[in-house]
Amino acid sequence: MALIDTRDLYKIYQVGDVEVRALNGVSVAIEQGEFVAVMGPSGSGKSTFMNILGCLDKPTRGTYILDGIDVTATDLSKLAGVRNRKIGFVFQGFNLIKRTSALENVELPMIYNHTPAAQRRKKAMQALEAVGLAQRADHLPNQLSGGQQQRVAIARSLVCDAPIIFADEPTGNLDTKMSIEVMDLFTRLNKEMGKTIILITHEPDIAQYATRLIKFKDGQKISDEKQIPCGAACMPKEDK
């Protein structure tokens, strides 16, 4: 059984007398350990699709099975628990709390899980070590570079041992050098830790890090192809 399996998903909004179909019959299966990039122009449905996959929203109709759980049949009140166990999120804006240290930011999801303090600190340090930032554990976000802040956000996505990481435009606020640093980290998490990575991006060079590329247009999946990742070799060269 696929880790993620959507069948004929629709998301329909009523705007006055107009019916807007943000998703129009999308079926996708993603296996454990895949690295998938999702691309499409603004309004293509890719963000709506990500919100449903991330248990942040539910489809109007269709079925979504997440690691054996029928998300579409699960009460919204219970989806937060499913989301916290199964999914880690990384966003373009980092979403770090400014007045707390890198370590405390990484600990945050475990507070919601009622993890004991000593265990929280240990797991948060392990996550920071995994992203190469253990030596920056006591630094505030404004004492870190953009790339380092995003690595803290990635560490935060790891601490609950979720099998899936959803990354929504994770390099959107980063220069080329920092983008390569972050994308190399995603590649390592995928290859060495077996994390399933689902990446939304509008940048073709960033999408080349993935082993599979899905494209959306007008609420529909228009292509779904395997690819050989070329990573940093596909990134534009910075001017000297």
Q: Where do the PLM segments sit?
A:
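Conserved beta-strand-loop-alpha-helix hinge in the C-terminal portion
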Residues: Q220-K240
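ABC family nucleotide-binding domain
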Residues: A2-F216
